Amino acid sequence: IGSSGLADRCEDTVYFGDGTRAVVLRSNGGTTLCPPTARDGVPISTTIKLNEYITTHTYGGPGSYKISMTDPNRNAGVINLPNSVNQVFYIESYLVISTFSGPNSSPILSFPPIDKGCVGHCFYHNPGAYDLDGDSLSYELTDCRGTGGIPIAGYSYPATGGGGTYNINSISGTLSWCVPQLQGEYNLAFIIKEWRKNADGEYKLVGYILRDLQVDVGTCLNDNPVIQPISDTCVLAGTVISKTVRATDPDGDVITLSANGGPFGVTAPIATFASSPGISPVTGIFQWNTVCAHIRKAPYPVTIKAIDSDPSISLVDFKTFNITVVAPPPTSLTATPLGTFIKLRWNKPSCHQITGNKIEKYCVYRKADCNPWNHAPCETGVPAYTGFVLVGCTSSMNDTTLIDTNGGAGLAQGTNYSYLVVAVFTDNAESYASNQVCVQLKRDVPVLINVDVKTTSTSTGSIFVRWIKPLLNTSTALDTVALPGPYEMKLSYYNGFAASTYTTIYTVTKTYFAGINQLADTTFTQTGLNTSDLPYTYKIDFYANGTFIGSAQKASSVFLK
């Protein structure tokens, strides 16, 4: 606020949006102006003071609440706000308390709105907002509000001149006014919206903050400093990220760099930014030692501010970049053929012991070739373009096995299959993909090779079925030591292409595998069928000592209708 004593509040009133309010004492600064309990605030320039008011309020239950504060009055003579001296200053935060969304913290605004503008030069402001819960933030311009939060009649966005712009970047939050036309005071406002994805995958509004700022525009011969572009980055949890920030000034002024954002407000270790004011060009070093507790789906925004030292009016520039902290992958993935199924097993990732945003499950992906795929630095999970498809997910962090049954249909003999596994966290963040394994099914179950209609009839039709026996004494054969006999094959069928109940029509049992291997006849002809009107589907199940080994992939008779 300005330094005017009339506007200096030792206490102020906050309205909680549930029909209640509280008078809150100022809580920062010394005790000279507001004895005996309130404090004085902290001057941050000759004309600006930082005042903090802190209180606690408990809501009665779920709902949506507007938390607001009103303060009379705005300065007189604000150019884009008529009769400004009689318009109250109003700000609000919108809070959604919901059973689906869980605990919620409002975004933190780390850069105060204290910069000035200059006629003919772009004015920039960025609040340096970040959200500790990892909620997504978006930004939009709005009108300044008055009594009751109603937009002030006659308010207008500031003039920009022909071809100029006044906007806010909806992602980075940088407000740009290019360029101010007239000296004087202006009031600007924007909203920072907070979004969270629900169980249906839809983003829902869980809160917003209204920032209202005063900008004093003067005249100067200064030019804005320029921060060089900074690329977004993904980093494996547990490693150190370091970024060098560079800024220049067209006038050769001394530049001061500062940084704010998510990495400065997280659980330790927090980020550091080292830079000293210097004549253009100037550099700063951002560094952050990430740990497992920093893993989350949403990136961490970091906003850099550069301000020059022009003696008339200092101008600024902002740049925002994002850091995504990615979880390490599950390790030691193995794939073991089991009949026409494949059993996957892996070890937990190194970050499995964290609480809060913890591992909820693992998801397994498959494709039908052995071509390798390696993720890019910012590719988490398994993208669709890789050709991998989701096989299934486990139910917990401790469940580190999954059997791929291909939906119960079994996998194809003679096909190479590749697998990857990914850890999925509470906020749906995905780890990097695991090591890729490739495997081919063993020939340890029979394989159907013929299902042919021999006779077409509505009642006396027949179908010929033929299969290949399981192999012995090859690298992909049945392990008879691990799976001793007796051995049994069951041929079953059902009417149609999809059914849950099979009828067994042929069984053969042998004490030793040699008996299976020596079978001369591996065919069966089923009669008494309606092959004119119905298709028939067949499968062969194979057992060792009563243990189900697997099934031949199902096959159906040709049926034209």
For each predicted feature, which ranges?
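Strand-loop-strand motifs at the edges of beta-sheets in extracellular beta-sandwich domains
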Residues: S156-P180, P269-V291
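Short, solvent-exposed loop/turn segments at the edges of extracellular beta-sandwich modules
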Residues: R74-I79, K193-K204, A306-S314, V424-E430, ...
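Beta-strand-rich modules
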Residues: D404-E430, A520, Q526-F548
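Extracellular interdomain linkers/hinges and stalk-like, low-complexity segments
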Residues: S84-G134, A199-D251, S312-F341
